[in-house]
Amino acid sequence: DTWDLLFYRSLLPGSTLLIGYFILFHYRAMNDFRAIGQPGIVNALFILGSNITFILALANTNVANALVMISLVPLIASIFSFIFLNEKPELITWICSLVCMIAVIFIFYESLSLNQYLGDFYGVICASFVAASLTVMRNNSHINFVPSYILGKLMTALVSLFFVSSFALGLSL
């Protein structure tokens, strides 16, 4: 099930990273979590959004299409950097972006005929969340965003907890 996968895909790395972080940085770990401030909370929400939309993309289209849509992260990040950080990309960046957009439109059009467009849409949204996260981190490079990532993973586990159909792992050894 999609939500079961999302729950474990978030809980296990999130809790492992949390424990590891406190073991490695036990004296300063709490201060690091407090120091993320508003940018860290916003970034954690983007991580939450990207985790959810990634799994929904995989559940609603083929893996290749989902990954192509998610590979748009650099394109979307450059657009966000242009809009929010006032960066001026070079002409070649805009040309490459246009070529990528044409390819994505072609893939999206094909998905419309196969009725798999929802997964492609989730893939683009996922890429947008990741690009937004990168933009926040670039704009606040003085912040340690590892605690923010951990928080985002644990928030994803908490949200997905409400939709889990079974806690059975179904491991076969």
Predicted feature residues:
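Membrane-interface helix termini and inter-helical loops of multi-pass transporters
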Residues: 1-2, 28-30, 59, 105-118, ...
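Transmembrane alpha-helical segments that form core, pore/gating elements
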Residues: 2, 14-17, 22, 77-78, ...
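Structural motif at transmembrane-helix junctions in multi-pass transporters
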Residues: 1-5, 52-69, 145-147
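Hydrophobic/aromatic residues within transmembrane alpha-helices
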Residues: 5, 9, 57, 83-85, ...
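Hydrophobic residues within alpha-helical transmembrane segments
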Residues: 7-12, 38, 42-45, 72, ...
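C-terminal transmembrane-helix exit sites in multi-pass transporters
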Residues: 16, 54-56, 73-95, 105, ...
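Hydrophobic transmembrane alpha-helices of multi-pass small-molecule transport proteins
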Residues: 17, 89-109, 126-130, 157
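Loop-to-transmembrane-helix transition segments
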Residues: 29-53, 118-126, 161, 170-173
